[in-house]
Swiss-Prot record:
Keywords: Hydrolase, Metalloprotease, Protease. Probable metalloprotease. Its EC number is 3.4.-.-. The keyword Oxidoreductase does not apply. This is Metalloprotease MJ0996. It comes from Methanocaldococcus jannaschii (strain ATCC 43067 / DSM 2661 / JAL-1 / JCM 10045 / NBRC 100440). InterPro entries: Metalloprtase-TldD/E_C, Metalloprtase-TldD/E_cen_dom, Metalloprtase-TldD/E_N, Peptidase_U62_metallo, TldD, TldD/PmbA_N, TldD/PmbA_sf. GO terms for biological process: proteolysis. GO terms for molecular function: metallopeptidase activity. It comes from the Archaea. Belongs to the peptidase U62 family. GO terms for cellular component: cytosol. Pfam families: PmbA_TldD_1st, PmbA_TldD_2nd, PmbA_TldD_3rd.
C-alpha cells in the first residue's frame, strides 16, 4: 500500500505539482468471419507527475508504482520544470479551484470485469450468427472492457480516488451482390455490461439490414439541398466541427473559427450546443477530469450565441475564464482540452412533423468519418446511408452521400431540431491521445452541400 500522506508531502515542490496513479485491467475479444481471432487480458499500472515552476512545466511518467519511484519522478519533474522555465516564452497561470477530497465509483449495474469470459464470447458469437446472410460476405465483431483505479493528488490539497469501468462493442459487415459492395456497422457501450446485453442483438440486425438495404440504393444526388441529419450524423458534426472549434487550446493557437467570437451570434436561434460530463451512464461522462476538476454541464452555444470555450486549468487561467472540467488525458499522457458528451439540445419537433414539413430534401444517416479544418471553418463528412425526401415522405434509399460546407453557414441555416435525444459512443483522437466521448442530440434540419 502506498503512503498517500507521504506522497502529498513530496508534492510540495515548485509552484504547483500533481500526480496521477493508475491501476488498470483490460480484456479484448475479436471475431472475424465466425472465428475467434483474439481473447486477451492485460494489466497496466503507472504514474504521471507534473510540476510547474514559474512558467515552466516538468512532466514525467513511469510504469513502476512505488514510493521510491514516485519520489524520483517528482524530483525529476521539478528539475525539468526549472529548465523549461528558462526557455519559456509565455506566462503560465492556473485557474484557482477549491481542493477536493473524494472517493467514488463509476461502474454501472454490471461490472464488465465480473462477467465471465465465456459469456462475453457467447455474445460475440451470437452477434455474428445474427448478422449472417447469403449476401453478407464478411463479418467482424470486437469487444473490449477496461477497469481502472485512479488516485489523483495535487499540492493544493486535493485527493481523489476513483474506480471506473467501460465496455464497448463494434460490429461490422460487408454485403456483396453483382460486384456491388456495401457496408453496415453499429456499436454500443457504456460503464456497465448491461449496455452490451441489452443492445447487441438489435444492433447486429440493424448493421446487417443496412448493408443489405444499400445494395439496392441509388447514388445520392449532388448539390445544395435542404437536409435532415439523424442524431448520429448531427452529433458527429457538433463534435467535430463545433466542439473541437470551441476547445480553448485551439482558440489560443489561432486554429478556431470561434476565435474572438464570445458573446457573438454563430448560429440560428435553434442552435444550443452543450458539453456535459455529468450525464449518467453516457460513454463520455466522468466525475472529475484529469486535473481534479469536477465534470460539468457547459453550454457552449445558447440559442445561437457563443457563450464559452472548453477549458483546462491552464487555458482558463490564460483567458481568465470559468473552469469547465475538460482537462483530460489518455492513460499517463498530459492533460489537454477535450470534450466529454457533446450534443445539440433537442427542440420541439417530432421526426414525423419535421419530415412532413420538409417536403423535398435528403435525410442523411450515420457517419463514416470525414475531415474538419477548425481554423478555416470547413468540414466534409460521409454519411452511412441516405433517403430522398419527396412530398414529406422518405422514398428512395441512397448511397455515397457526403456533407460539406462552412461550419458557421450550416449553423446559421439550422431551422429545426427534433425532441428525440440519442448519444453515440466512441473515442475521440487529438494530439495522439484517444479518450471516450459521446455525441448526438436530435435530428437537425439545415441547408448544406451534398457531395
Amino acid at each position: 500500500m502506498l503512503n498517500l500522506e507521504k506522497i502529498e508531502k513530496l508534492l510540495e515542490v515548485g509552484d504547483y505539482a500533481d500526480i496521477r496513479i493508475n491501476f488498470g485491467e483490460s480484456n479484448t475479444i475479436t471475431l472475424k468471419d465466425g472465428k475467434i481471432e483474439e481473447i486477451s487480458s492485460g494489466f497496466g499500472n503507472g504514474v504521471a507527475v507534473r510540476v510547474l515552476y514559474k512558467n515552466g512545466w516538468g512532466f514525467v511518467t513511469s510504469n513502476i508504482v512505488s514510493e521510491e519511484e514516485i519520489e524520483k519522478l517528482i524530483n525529476k519533474a521539478y528539475k525539468m520544470a526549472k529548465i523549461s522555465n528558462e526557455y519559456s516564452e509565455k506566462e503560465i497561470i492556473l485557474k484557482d479551484y477549491k481542493a477536493i477530497i473524494d472517493n467514488y465509483k463509476m461502474i454501472g449495474k454490471i461490472n464488465p470485469t465480473d462477467v465471465d469470459i465465456e459469456e462475453k464470447k457467447e455474445i460475440i458469437i451470437d452477434t455474428y450468427k445474427n448478422m449472417t446472410d447469403e449476401k453478407i460476405k464478411s463479418i467482424s465483431v470486437s469487444y473490449s472492457d477496461v477497469f481502472g483505479k485512479r488516485i489523483f493528488m495535487i499540492s493544493e490539497g486535493s485527493r481523489i480516488e476513483g474506480e471506473i469501468t467501460r465496455c464497448i462493442m463494434y460490429m461490422n459487415c460487408v454485403a456483396k451482390e453483382n460486384g456491388n459492395l456495401q457496408y453496415g456497422a453499429e456499436r454500443t457501450g457504456g460503464f456497465g455490461f448491461e449496455k452490451i446485453k441489452d443492445n447487441y442483438l438489435n444492433l447486429a440486425l440493424e448493421a446487417k439490414n443496412r448493408a443489405l438495404r444499400l445494395l439496392k440504393a441509388k447514388p445520392c444526388p449532388k448539390g445544395k439541398f435542404k437536409v435532415i441529419l439523424d442524431p448520429e450524423l448531427a452529433g458527429v458534426f457538433i463534435h467535430e466541427a463545433v466542439g473541437h472549434a470551441s476547445e480553448a487550446d485551439l482558440v489560443l493557437q489561432n486554429d478556431s473559427v470561434f476565435k474572438d467570437k464570445l458573446g457573438e451570434r454563430v448560429g440560428s436561434e435553434y442552435v444550443t450546443v452543450i458539453d456535459d460530463a455529468t450525464i449518467e451512464g453516457a460513454f463520455g461522462s466522468y466525475k472529475y477530469d484529469d486535473e481534479g476538476v469536477e465534470g460539468k454541464k457547459t453550454v457552449i452555444i445558447e440559442n445561437g450565441i457563443l457563450k464559452t470555450y472548453l477549458h483546462s486549468r491552464e487555458t482558463a487561467g490564460r483567458m481568465d475564464a470559468e473552469l469547465t472540467g475538460n482537462g483530460r488525458a489518455e492513460g499517463l499522457n498530459k492533460p489537454i482540452v477535450r470534450m466529454s458528451n457533446t450534443f445539440i439540445k433537442p427542440g420541439d419537433w417530432s421526426f414525423e412533423e419535421l419530415l412532413e414539413d420538409t417536403k423535398e430534401g435528403i435525410f442523411l444517416k450515420g457517419s463514416r468519418g470525414g475531415q474538419v479544418d477548425t481554423g478555416k471553418g470547413l468540414f466534409q463528412f460521409s454519411a452511412v446511408e441516405a433517403y430522398l425526401i419527396e412530398n414529406g415522405e422518405l422514398t428512395q434509399v441512397l448511397k455515397d452521400a457526403g456533407l460539406s460546407g462552412e461550419i458557421l453557414d450550416i449553423l446559421f441555416k439550422v431551422d429545426a431540431v427534433t425532441k428525440d435525444f440519442e448519444l453515440s459512443v466512441g473515442y475521440c483522437g487529438k494530439d495522439g491521445q484517444s479518450v471516450p466521448v459521446g455525441d448526438g442530440g436530435g435530428c437537425v434540419r439545415t441547408i448544406a452541400t451534398v457531395s
